[in-house]
Structures are given as structure tokens and as C-alpha cells.
Amino acid sequence: MMQERKQKGKILVFSSREICYLSSNFFANQIGAAFEKLGYEVTVCELSKEDDLDAKLARYIGQPYRLILDFNSLLPRMVLDDGTPYVDRLAGPFFDYILDHPLFHYQGLSSGVKNLHAIVLDEAQQKYVEKYYEKVASVHMLPLGATRAVYEGTKEPECRILFPGTYDRPDAVYQIVENAPEPLGSMMKDLIERRLADPTLPMEEAFSQHLKEEELELPAGQFALFMNSMYAVDAYVRDYFRKAALDALLAEKLPVTVFGEGWEKYSCGDGHSLRREPAVPFALSFERIAKAHVLLNVSPIFNRGMHDRVPAGMANHAVVLTDENPYLRRTFTGGKELLFYSLEKPDTLCEQAERALTDVRLREKIAASAYETFEREYTWKRRAEQILAFAEEVEA
């Protein structure tokens, strides 16, 4: 097997930064194991603040790799003593798997690194990077894979809706908007209004609409810089709709459990239907999801893509109740693999939640169909195969 791996080549996977709930380390090890199963010799390098980065990173320079992969990478920002970007000294295509909106990664994407390829979770975000970060060598759209719980156990006795995620009070986030200098503050308020009115409107399209109505034009670099400066818009929209979803469900006294950071900040009129559970490392979240009957997804930051909560629920036999967008509608069949609702119409959320909570046969049918789709399309092995195809494509 070792000889076969040497013939196939080497793959280097980084975890260059700690992402919420230690998810970067988890993703790096999951995809690394998948590459190994495909016969590649894999090195997973996890970086920390305590490391001697120069010494740790130098060992990989000049070694031939089939591909190099990182998640929300810090490496495109790193420069060697001679001024050469570190990534450009790596012998193999470097892929940065971006797990949120690329607007948050302005510094890395605009670094001018020649050997930088991006993978994003959303089709609109793919077009955004292609248009506004022209120096990025290639851009690919690929939702994350998912993992089955190691110890699935049995479903919890009470049928409840589980929402795993982070929360902050929308009014607290809005203070960033209020305190922003002009014209940034007015722009951000306008973008928020547009995105609340149309939750499937990508932020960059909202900004383009604003500029057109104001008869303003910005070169690509400045457009991307303004987007980065208006990060609070994305954060506000996310938390606004998370609060709205929970408010609607709890107003109907539907049982909801939340777990993750920040939920102590959430308050509602009727707390009897709400349970709060503490955050856990990402690797342990699948055990909790596997016990749930219904998994809620609220992700207005992916307007043409998919948050990893969706395949996580599919992999662990939880019925995924998700806000709809054009990509999800095209990729899945409502009532077969997922249940859809509209962020614009809270009553659709409550109606679908009621169906999921009360119809056992529907839950069994959807969970079984969704699991088949997961096995076919959303395993880490499948993701490894697709990333290898990207590497072949960029080197052709």
C-alpha cells in the first residue's frame, strides 16, 4: 500500500487557523483521511500560535505535491524573507477552502499569490471571487462533506427541533452599523434593508444595486474592499433571521433546542418550549445531531449554496428543515430529501415544522432518502475525488 501511495503522490493538508468549534482541524483530518483511502500519501499540518512557523513551514517548500489544501487559510498572507509569498514556493496547486463569504477574506484573496485557487460553498460567491479577485488562479464551488456520528445511539424520546449554531443579538451587531463613518453607515443600512426584503439576494448584488441607483461606479479592487468593510451586514442578516426563525417557532409553542455559543443572549416571551445546550467541539456535534429528529438550518449568508448543517443532518438521519434558495431547490426535492421554508414567510417555517414533528412516516421517508443522497454525494471521499478533479483541471 505504501508503494501505491508513493506512486499516486503526496497531498498536504493544512489547518492554519482555529475556526469556531475547532472545525478547521476537524475538516483537515476528515479530508486527509479520505485522500489516504484513495491511495495518496497525506500530511496534515496543524498550526498554532505557539509554533515556530518559519521552521514548521519551511520543511514543505520544494516538495512535490499533487495538491495542497487549507480551510479559511492564513497562508496566502505569509511572505518569506526574500519577499516571495510562501504559497508560491509550494510545489503543487494550493486550494483555499473558504467556509464563509469571501468578503471576510479580502487580505488573502487580494494578496496577488499566483498559486492560489479558491473553493467556495456558494455559486454566487464563486462568481464574486471570479469577478472581483481576478488574480485568484481558479475558483470552484463545492459544498462541504459531512460525517456520521461514531456512536449514533437512538433518537431522543421527545421529538424536538434542533438548531446548532452561533448567535448574537441583532441589535448589538447593528451598533457596528450605527457607529460606522459615512458613507459606509448609510450603505450598510441600505444593504440590510435590501437583504431583509429579499433573503436570497446575495450581498454583492445588493451593493451593485445600491451603486447603480446612486449612479456610482467602483473598480473591482475598491468594490471588494468596501464589501470587506461592510462585514457587519452579513453578520446582522444572519442573526436577524436566526432570531426571527426561533421567534416564529416558539410563538407557536413548537419545541426547539439550540446549542452553540451566544444563546444566553437570546430571549423570547415563552421560554418553556426552548432548551439551551452548551457548545461542543465540531467533532462531537454529529453525536448530538444523530439524536435529533429534526434539524433546523437558517443560512441567509449562502444564497446560492449550502451550509454544512444540511449534509450533517442528512448523514445522521435527521430531517433537515432549511430555508430555500435557488441552488437548494435545483439540487434537492422538497418533501423527499429536505423540507423547505421561506425566510420571507415565517408561517411556512411553522407549517413545515409541524409536519416534521407530528408525521413519523414522513420523517422516516425523508431521512432514508436523504441518507442515500449523502452516501452518494456528500461523503468526504466524494469531496476528495472532486478536489482531485479540480487539481487535474487547473494543471491541464
Please place each PLM-identified region on the residue numbering.
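Catalytic binding pocket for nucleotide-activated donors in carbohydrate/polymer assembly enzymes
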Residues: L12-L22, F26-L38, T43-L47, S111-G112, ...
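Nucleotide-sugar donor-binding catalytic core of glycosyltransferases
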Residues: Q7, S15-S23, F27, A137-N303, ...
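Short, surface-exposed amphipathic charged segments that create phosphate/polyanion-binding patches used
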Residues: L109-V113, G153-I161, A353-L357
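Extended catalytic core of nucleotide-activated donor transferases of GT-like folds
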Residues: M2, L12-S16, S24-Y132, T147-Y151, ...
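Extreme N-terminal leader/targeting regions
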Residues: M1-Q7
